[in-house]
């Protein structure tokens, strides 16, 4: 190939690539973005007293579950597992609530993305109900799901070791630097993970009901996390920022409002701290949909036209509770 031919072919290749790139841009417009403020109009109507709270008819059922998030579907799973089926579930503002997901497209190659919770840490040894649920849903495998759970590699994702970008470089863990206070705090947390009371109960366990009831630990519930940190002499701004962030993320309040027990429980109660987490393309919507299948939840367009429900199969309706009033062992 002489020089003229080489330059001709190079120009042709460059022109073809440029044309293809422009064609790709023309045919693949970025999707438009819209914000769905779930429940906002109804919340404003309630705030402004624009909705009547008096009921127009009375209906009853064995069990009414409000919402369709993790707590609601877990409750339905437990009831069905124990033989109850006369259950009505009010879906709430969004299907699957805090486990909701978004699907773009209707084919097998559709894009799925979580709009709610997106991962689940591997359940601790004390979280036997969660392990049992995951076993029922086929997520935990093996003959000893409660004591020796086996997970599919397709369901596990390892967290990156380096995920904080600060001062021009990546840092291991979740903090840009490990100062003396930070090291001391996490060394203390490492001991708390194995701390037990005189009865052999873990000081901090998940679920929290299995945590020690001993006064030496429960007295931490009477002071704030911020007060405890000051008592222990922690002054690092980086550590304080991180602990406040964690509390706001999990509890909705910072270290000045969250109790010391709750703050320490966040770090000390989780088993498998550095293990891979369970996640899917649509986040925990994957578990929510599996729960619906396990329960056999059938969707209804409206409430059944009867005064007393005798559902043979759990059902759901697109409804929201505006007012809940306790009345003995029942609610209105």
Residue ranges and their predicted role:
Residues 62-89:
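N-terminal Rossmann-like FAD-binding beta1-loop-alpha1 element of flavoenzymes
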Residues 1-62, 81:
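Extreme N-terminal leader/targeting segments of oxidoreductases
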Residues 77, 98-102, 131, 176:
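Short, solvent-exposed loop/turn and secondary-structure capping segments
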Residues 203-330:
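Active-site/ligand-binding neighborhood in enzyme catalytic cores
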Residues 80-105:
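Glycine-rich FAD pyrophosphate-binding loop
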Residues 97-128, 210-212:
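Glycine-rich active-site loop/strand segments that organize a redox cofactor
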Residues 135, 143-257, 273:
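Mobile amphipathic helical/loop "lid" adjacent to a hydrophobic cofactor/ligand pocket
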């Amino acid at each position: 190939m002489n020089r003229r031919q080489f330059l001709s072919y190079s120009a042709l290749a460059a022109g073809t690539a440029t044309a293809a790139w422009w064609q790709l841009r023309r045919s693949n417009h970025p999707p438009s973005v819209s914000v769905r403020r779930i429940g906002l109009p109804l919340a404003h109507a309630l705030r402004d007293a624009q909705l009547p709270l008096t009921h127009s008819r009375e209906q009853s059922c064995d069990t009414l579950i409000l919402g369709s998030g993790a707590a609601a579907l877990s409750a339905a799973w437990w009831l069905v597992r124990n033989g109850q089926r006369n259950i009505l579930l009010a879906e709430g503002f969004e299907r699957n609530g805090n486990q909701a997901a978004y699907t773009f497209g209707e084919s097998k190659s559709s894009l799925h993305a979580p709009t709610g919770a997106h991962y689940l840490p591997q359940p601790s040894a004390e979280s036997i109900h969660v392990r049992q649920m995951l076993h029922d849903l086929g997520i935990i495998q093996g003959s000893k799901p409660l004591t020796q759970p086996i997970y599919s590699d397709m369901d596990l994702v390892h967290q990156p070791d380096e995920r904080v970008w600060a001062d021009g470089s990546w840092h291991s863990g979740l903090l840009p630097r490990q100062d003396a206070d930070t090291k001391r705090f996490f060394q203390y947390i490492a001991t708390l993970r194995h701390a037990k009371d005189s009865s052999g109960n873990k000081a901090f366990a998940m679920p929290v009901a299995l945590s020690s009831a001993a006064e030496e630990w429960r007295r931490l519930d009477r002071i704030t996390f911020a007060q405890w940190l000051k008592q222990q002499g922690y002054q690092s701004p980086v550590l304080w920022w991180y602990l406040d962030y964690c509390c706001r993320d999990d509890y909705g309040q910072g270290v000045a409002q969250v109790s010391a027990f709750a703050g320490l429980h966040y770090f000390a109660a989780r088993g498998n701290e550095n293990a891979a987490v369970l996640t899917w393309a649509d986040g925990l919507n994957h578990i929510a949909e599996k729960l619906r299948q396990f329960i056999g939840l059938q969707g209804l367009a409206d409430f059944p036209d009867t005064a007393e429900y005798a559902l043979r199969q759990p059902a759901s309706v697109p409804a929201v509770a505006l007012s809940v009033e306790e009345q003995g062992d029942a609610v209105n």
